[in-house]
């Protein structure tokens, strides 16, 4: 699961809200190997997911998926798969965060936006996004 925090989600004047957490789950065949096969991608859109099983080849670059943050005008933003190239984001594992950072993510009130990778949410998000029948 890759997660992003946005302080404000306001695609239209007068609409939107403070705080937005979005994430994409990349489902792989074997996390133990150097270049696992990407089986599916499930980007979040507020409380739901879209699923690509398997992802289109032009939306994958090697072992990376191409994800964009897009406006779902007029209400909000969401993550989606894209064919466009972009920048790579550093991967920071939950275990790499300091105790203070994990504690802040666990306890900060983000309103209706919830931290997808914190202990109380992680497994539920995986279950909800499960793309395989």
Swiss-Prot record:
Q: Which residues form a coiled coil?
A: none
Q: What is its main location?
A: secreted
- Motif Conserved undecapeptide motifI I, residue range(s) on this chain: 1-9
Domain of life of the source: Eukaryota
The short motif Hepta-peptide GHRHDWE motif II is annotated over 16-22
Q: Which keywords does the record carry?
A: Secreted, Virulence
Spell out the subcellular localization from the entry: Secreted
User: Which GO CC terms are listed, alphabetically?
Assistant: extracellular region
Tell what triggers its expression: Expression gradually increases to a maximum at 7 days after inoculation of pepper leaves.
Q: Which Pfam families match?
A: NPP1
Taken from the UniProt record, the cysteine pairs bridged by disulfide bonds within this chain are none
Q: What is known of its domains?
A: Key residues/motif important for the effector activities are degenerated in most NLPs, including the nlp24 peptide consisting of the conserved region I (11-aa immunogenic part) and conserved region II (the heptapeptide GHRHDWE motif) that is important for phytotoxic activity.
* Family (UniProt): Belongs to the Necrosis inducing protein (NPP1) family.
Its biological purpose is as follows: Secreted effector that contributes strongly to virulence during infection by P.capsici. Causes large necrotic areas in both host C.annuum and non-host N.benthamiana.
Q: What is this protein called?
A: NLP effector protein 14
Species for this entry? Phytophthora capsici
């Amino acid at each position: 699961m890759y997660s992003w925090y946005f302080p404000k989600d306001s695609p239209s004047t007068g609409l939107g809200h403070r705080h937005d957490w979005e994430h994409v789950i990349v489902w792989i065949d074997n996390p133990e190997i150097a270049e696992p096969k990407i089986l599916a991608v499930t980007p979040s859109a507020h409380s739901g997911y879209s699923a690509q099983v398997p992802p289109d080849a032009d939306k994958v670059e090697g072992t990376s998926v191409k994800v964009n943050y897009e406006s779902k005008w007029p209400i909000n933003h969401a993550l989606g798969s894209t064919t466009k190239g972009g920048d790579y984001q550093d991967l920071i594992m939950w275990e790499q965060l300091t105790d203070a950072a994990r504690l802040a993510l666990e306890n900060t009130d983000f309103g209706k936006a919830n931290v997808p990778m914190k202990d109380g949410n992680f497994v539920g998000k995986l279950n909800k996004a499960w793309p395989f029948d």
